[in-house]
Amino acid sequence: MSWVQVNLLVRSLSRGWGGLCRPALSGTPFAQVSLQALRGLHCSAATHKDEPWLVPRPPEPQRKPIKVPAMHEDLFKPSGNRERDKASFLNAVRSFGAHNVRKRGHVDFIYLALRKMPEFGVERDLSVYNLLLDVFPKEVFRPRNVIQRIFVHYPRQQECGVAVLEQMERHGVMPSAETEFLLIQIFGRKSYPMLKFLRMKLWFTRFKNINPYPVPRDLPQDPLDLAKLGLRHMEPDLSAKVTVYQMSLPSDSTGMEDPTQPHIVGIQSPDQQAALARHNPSRPVFVEGPFPLWLRNKCVYYHILRADLPPPEEEKVEEIPEEWELYYPQKLDLEYSRSGWDDYEFDVDEVTEGPVFAMCMAGAHDQATLIKWIQGLQETNPTLAQIPVVFRLARSTGELLTTSRLEGQSPPHSPPKGPEEDDETIQAEQQQGQS
């Protein structure tokens, strides 16, 4: 830079700073100082506008046209009359590797494949997850030195690998040795996906059989079999008997008296039958429900037949024979060396409820269907004929019905509703009842 250019630059800067310092020293208000400063700086900028060679601008880089990536959605669209099954999903994953040799956009493709897995029914297949991990390029994302190990090396790719393992964990898929080999080959041993794999390998083996009442992985598709499974899952007594009171008619049945006949399945144990036989006929029993029960990803609804807690004067204390006390003592008075500060009782909030006499699952939750269930229970429980029944359903107010009305009255069925509309109505009415 020549002396002439330096001189011009210093003069322009002195003009700007002079406009700032001179009014401040003379006691000018702050608003006027800022205004004068802006004017001085504006004038200096105007003088340099005619001299572009003083402050040269860097050349703007040429913007390349953005390449729109190929839409991966087309790979998962079934061609022709093919169904959405495992074969079509594997074909889509393999076609991505065949058409895209350099595997550009593989992270977006893997995220899309994870979202599409439930549609193809392969969210519980280990081989499909291993095939998705095989989409990653090998030996590229492994850290090579200490600095790369300290900082997250290729974070977006590691997050995608962790997302694959998290979906496996969500669906209860145990990773195998092939999964470990792929993770080491892709990300190395010192990586977040490998750390996630080690944690899954540790805790999956410990929590695999933690549920004392396991539910089968593949649930039956028939509503009747699903109802039997749900009732067996709720009833702790193994001697309880499952009874089918009414079978559902097929959808193409015509010319029948009741074309909308739903299924009715009930369960009752011998102890419940004995408790119902000892029930006071002057006190009513209640049919309550429907209550939800989740069996993995399916929700079924059940009803119960219960009674209120009897008053203390009507409770009968069962005497335990002395022979039972010898083999199965009910009370143990063992004196250990304890001080007066020891608490012999635990703080447990126990709420005593009335007895439950039976449970059922039906294809419809209206009063007409549950009346047929009560009529079926009267065949094995004769004392139920002298006990009034009160229906406390979520969609109706309680109505007192005696046995004579149950036998002589057969209300017409309500128009059939779809399962989604039926579930939404039940949930809405349950919320209204709670409020």
UniProtKB/Swiss-Prot annotation:
It is found in: Cytoplasm; Nucleus; Mitochondrion. Pfam families: ECSIT_C (PF14784), ECSIT_N (PF06239). Ubiquitinated on Lys-372; leading to translocation in the nucleus together with RELA and NFKB1 and expression of NF-kappa-B-dependent genes. One of its GO terms (molecular function) is DNA-binding transcription factor activity. SMART domains: ECSIT_Cterm. InterPro entries: ECIST_C, ECSIT, ECSIT_N. Belongs to the ECSIT family. Adapter protein that plays a role in different signaling pathways including TLRs and IL-1 pathways or innate antiviral induction signaling. Plays a role in the activation of NF-kappa-B by forming a signal complex with TRAF6 and TAK1/MAP3K7 to activate TAK1/MAP3K7 leading to activation of IKKs. Once ubiquitinated, interacts with the dissociated RELA and NFKB1 proteins and translocates to the nucleus where it induces NF-kappa-B-dependent gene expression. As part of the MCIA complex, involved in the assembly of the mitochondrial complex I. This is Evolutionarily conserved signaling intermediate in Toll pathway, mitochondrial. It comes from Mus musculus.
